[in-house]
């Protein structure tokens, strides 16, 4: 079973994503901010990370930068799920090493397609 870490500060959004992942047969773990997410990623080494950009403690860009700087987490597929839809935001996220940048609102099909493409 593949493990996916969801880093999202909005509880309703986080819980909805967790339910969707569970229904699709993934093991999902969650963090409510970037700092906790970075810690959980280093501890659990998930197969994939879904992360918001704007969050307290540490934003998604900081999480991705931290993950990519550590050998144990550098190659974990990383997808941004965010309301930040400007082309500059997309470009910046991909330049930092994100595997995909999905803007909210997104459909279940879009999310599952991005996950399928990113998972090894």
Briefly describe each language-model feature range.
Residues 8:
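Conserved acidic carboxylate
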Residues 55-58:
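Receiver (REC) domain active-site loop signature in two-component systems and cognate sites
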Residues 30-39, 60:
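Helix N-cap/capping motif at the beta->alpha junctions
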Residues 39, 61-74:
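Short amphipathic alpha-helix used as the core "switch/output" element in two-component signaling
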Residues 11-29, 118:
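Two-component/phosphorelay signaling modules centered on CheY-like receiver
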Residues 15-18, 62, 85-100, 110-116:
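Alpha4 helix (beta4-alpha4-beta5 surface) of REC/receiver domains from two-component response regulators
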